[in-house]
A protein has these predicted regions:
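Acidic active-site catalytic centers that drive phospho-/nucleotidyl reactions
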Residues: 35, 83, 185
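Acidic, proline/glycine-enriched N-terminal capping motif
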Residues: 1-71, 79
Length: 325
């Protein structure tokens, strides 16, 4: 309706569609199902599996079986190499879930940390698995109707995962969200993907669920919640502190980039990632124009803003925020 504003300028309309905003609003009001087949997955197993993921991850990985940890992965300089999710599936079994575009780079980073004695191995299962995500206020109702597992908040807490059965399909369910709404990611063997989709879709039709594309998942949904993305917000040149992702307490275990990160924590950051809300898109010509990312941020007298390292301020990601008006 009125919340779906048109874009008349050709440049910023290239990868934009009013359908994105419409899907977003429906997801926020009811629920949306997202095809996340493009994810990359690899399992790290063996007696030294914990040591490998501890070495790679900024966050604590010595957690209970069934915990899901979202973590930055740093380079030696303390800048970002990646951000990804790691699930602890067993005492010596961890599953890494990351974006498909960066999956091979992440796999090599972890593989390079494997011990030479073979006490930990890495297996790429990207071609074997697919993922569906269901999010929105009605997500719990939709899933609960097709499984005997208890999907209540008390029984299935945020940042946990467990195996459940959905209409005869064995599913690894992870309660995590990149769009800022209640919901789960469901991982199944590729051959079971259609059956899982059908089961969720049939249940979702009774609760207003619609298919939602990556424009919502990767842009409007995440930006409304100020979630960061590797590449636009998280990059090697900027630190965890500058990105606002430092933890209150640093784990004792060593990890790549720890020395640099400890130094960054003790210093005043030269730059800070923040969210800007543009309430007037009218340009000097009178036409409404919209940012797409990488635009410079200037002072009121049109001068560049430069930090103590000589880096100029710029827009990392930009997109609509339909639920915020």
């Amino acid at each position: 309706g009125d919340k779906v504003m048109p874009r008349t300028a050709e440049w910023e309309s290239r990868w934009w569609s009013p359908i994105i905003n419409a899907e977003h609003l429906q997801m926020r009001e009811t629920a949306g199902i997202v095809d996340l087949t493009a994810f990359a997955y690899f399992d790290i197993t063996g007696p030294s599996a914990l040591a490998v993921v501890q070495k790679a991850a900024l966050r604590q990985m010595d957690v209970a079986i069934g915990r899901v940890v979202y973590t930055p992965v740093l380079g030696p300089n303390g800048g970002f190499k990646s951000d990804l999710t790691i699930m602890r599936l067993g005492e010596s079994h961890f599953r890494v879930v990351t974006g498909g575009a960066h999956g091979m780079a992440d796999k090599k980073w972890f593989a390079d940390l494997l011990p030479e004695d073979g006490s930990a191995t890495i297996k790429d299962i990207t071609s074997d698995y697919t993922t569906l995500g269901v999010w929105g206020p009605n997500a719990r109702k939709i899933v609960q109707e097709v499984t005997s597992a208890d999907m209540s908040n008390e029984a299935f807490k945020f940042s946990t995962c467990k195996e459940i059965d959905i209409k005869g399909v064995k599913v690894l369910a992870s309660r995590i969200s990149y769009v800022g709404d209640l919901g789960w990611e469901f991982y199944v063997p590729m051959a079971d993907g259609p059956a899982l989709w059908d089961a969720l879709w049939e249940s979702g039709k009774n609760h207003g669920m619609i298919p939602v594309g990556i424009g919502v998942y990767g842009t409007t949904g995440r930006l409304e919640k100020c979630y960061r993305a590797y590449g636009p917000e998280l990059e090697t040149e900027y630190t965890v502190v500058e990105a606002g992702m430092q933890t209150p307490k640093l784990k004792d275990a060593d990890f790549v980039g720890k020395e640099a990160h400890v130094k960054h924590r003790s210093e005043k950051p030269a730059a800070m990632l923040c969210t800007l809300f543009v309430d007037d898109h009218t340009s000097s010509t009178g036409e409404k124009r919209y940012m797409m990312g990488n635009e410079p941020i200037l002072t009121l007298d049109k001068q560049p803003i430069t930090d103590s390292h000589g880096r100029r301020s710029y827009v990392t990601s930009a997109g609509s925020a339909p639920s915020l008006g």
